[in-house]
Every structure is written in structure tokens, then in C-alpha cells.
């Protein structure tokens, strides 16, 4: 079951492009949605992994692992929650990734997504807080 257009995301501190994200109707995704509101939340990602094709941040909360699965190939725009609480957003296709995680959601349009993340990372290299990439996240699900 899919929660269409559950959130919208702007990539980078000064990002203006709105990206729609569909989320899965599972306990982990619903718990994350509970933390969000209709106001934009500035979300920091402290890990940028060009080789792994993802940005990540550890999130707190009691997330169930009921929907955890093994995913052989990861696609651009997919979001996963790992057992240690790491939330990953993949900005590149990663064939043979073989990850075990809970699918959270996916960007509905991935055209230009890779470049947007890379540009946000490059423009944020001197961040005083050590953040690699910022995301503005707004809950759009009613």
C-alpha cells in the first residue's frame, strides 16, 4: 500500500525545486510521518557516500523491523531505514547493493536528482556544523 505524495523535499539549504516522495504504508514510514508537520523541517544528513550512492543520517525513535527485507539492487530516489536507525536516501542506482533494510519511500521523479544531491553536497562543504547535505522536508499527506 502506497501513501502518494506523503512528503515534499527540497535538496540543499537553498534548494527551490520541490520533489514529491511516495511512502510505503508500513510502521516505520508512519512513525517518521508522525514527526513531520506541514511546515518545512530542515533535516541534516551528516554522511555523504559518493561510492555507495547515498546520503544518510541516524534517526531516533522506536521503529519496527516488521517490513525489513533484502534488496539486491537499489534505485535512484529510494529511501531505506536500517536496523541501527540509519535513514538512507540513494541518489544513484546501485546494482548489487544487497542491503537489508525497511523500504520507507521513493521520489516519484528522479530526473536531475543525482545532480541536485551532488551540487548540494559541493555547496555545503564549509558548513560549520559538519552537515554534508541539508534537506527541507514537508509533510503533504492529509
Label the predicted regions:
Residues 1-17:
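N-terminal low-complexity, Pro/Thr/Ser-rich intrinsically disordered segments
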Residues 33, 37-142:
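Glycine-rich active-site loops that engage anionic ligands at enzyme catalytic sites
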Residues 26-33:
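Extracytoplasmic/secreted envelope proteins and their assembly/folding machinery
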Residues 15-22, 63, 67:
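Second-shell loop/turn segments in exported
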Residues 14, 24-26, 48:
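Histidine- and/or cysteine-centered catalytic micro-motif in compact active-site loops
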Residues 12, 22-24, 134-140:
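A structural detector for beta-sheet-dominated domains
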Residues 18-25, 102-108:
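Short amphipathic beta-strand/extended segments with alternating polar/hydrophobic composition
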Amino acid at each position: 500500500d502506497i501513501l502518494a505524495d506523503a512528503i515534499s523535499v527540497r535538496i540543499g539549504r537553498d534548494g527551490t525545486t520541490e520533489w514529491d516522495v511516495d511512502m510505503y504504508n508500513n510502521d516505520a514510514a508512519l512513525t517518521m510521518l508522525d514527526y513531520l508537520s506541514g511546515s518545512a523541517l530542515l533535516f541534516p544528513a551528516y554522511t555523504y557516500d559518493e561510492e555507495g550512492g547515498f546520503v544518510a543520517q541516524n534517526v531516533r525513535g522506536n521503529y519496527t523491523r516488521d517490513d525489513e527485507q533484502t534488496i539486491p539492487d537499489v534505485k535512484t530516489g529510494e529511501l531505506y531505514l536500517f536496523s541501527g536507525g540509519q535513514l538512507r536516501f540513494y541518489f544513484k542506482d546501485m546494482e548489487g547493493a544487497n542491503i537489508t533494510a525497511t523500504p520507507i519511500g521513493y521520489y516519484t521523479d528522479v530526473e536531475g536528482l543525482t545532480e541536485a544531491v551532488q551540487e548540494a553536497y559541493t555547496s555545503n562543504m564549509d558548513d560549520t556544523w559538519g552537515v554534508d547535505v541539508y534537506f527541507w522536508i514537508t509533510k503533504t499527506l492529509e
